[in-house]
A protein has these predicted regions:
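Class II aminoacyl-tRNA synthetase-like tRNA-binding/catalytic domains
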Residues: 2-120, 128-132
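Extended, charged alpha-beta segments that form solvent-exposed binding/catalytic grooves
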Residues: 105-194, 198
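Conserved small/polar residues in nucleotide/adenosyl-binding loops
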Residues: 205-210
Length: 210
């Protein structure tokens, strides 16, 4: 927990009960808008998979999965998922989705080797989504348009929450800034670390997509 920062004398604006209500409110708002704008259908995701299935994402290849044996299946080993990157593609085919359609899910996972801080935890609770597009649509313009759509959903969610909770301020800029990793390197040639370059571009553009 060396990287967790809690300001001195920090006091939350909501108590624990109301925080849970607010979390549900923001999640409901965001996922409904996202599903509508991107033509996504909610599906249930696995918490664990067969390690021999090839469906567990090994992330960087060094993270150790949490595994356990299943008594009813003669001690067969199952692994808690790291992410759903591979499973989503499998599910799109399994559920029979068509071009222009997609799925989203509320994923839970355990990443035992995660370096924890204010935004990272060994317990993962995040949205995952994937949709089918044509080969012709696999281009930078489709990517940018999709990012803009997601960003608009974020802004609408922010606006909704700012109306519902008066202490929440709208801080997201109207537009999102796009830059490639090569362009970042050209802008900051004296900065060797990619993460540092991303940090510096964030100082110039608070909403950006690399």
């Amino acid at each position: 927990m060396d990287h967790l920062i809690i300001p001195k004398d920090y006091k939350p604006d909501l108590n624990l009960h109301d925080t849970q209500v607010a979390i549900k409110t923001v999640k409901d708002c965001f996922q409904e808008l996202l599903a509508e704008r991107l033509n996504l259908t909610r599906v249930s995701a696995p918490l664990f998979v067969d390690p021999d299935s090839g469906l567990n994402d090994n992330l960087n290849g060094v993270e150790r999965p949490v595994a356990f044996d299943i008594k009813e299946q003669d001690g067969k080993i199952a692994e808690i998922v790291h992410s759903l990157a591979k499973w989503k593609r499998y599910a799109l085919d399994k559920y029979g989705f068509s071009v222009g359609e997609g799925l989203y899910t509320d994923m839970n996972a355990i990443r035992r080797d995660e370096e924890t801080d204010n935004i990272h935890s060994i317990f993962v609770d995040q949205w995952d989504w994937e949709k089918i597009i044509t080969k012709e649509d696999r281009n930078i313009e489709t990517l940018k348009e999709t990012v803009r759509t997601v960003y608009k959903v974020l802004r609408k969610t922010e606006k909704y929450m700012s109306i519902k909770y008066d202490y929440i301020q709208e801080i997201l800029p109207k537009d999102i800034f796009f830059i490639t990793t090569q362009e970042l390197e050209d802008v900051f040639p004296d900065v060797s670390s990619p993460k540092e370059r991303e940090y510096y571009i964030c100082l110039l553009y608070t909403s950006r997509c690399v």
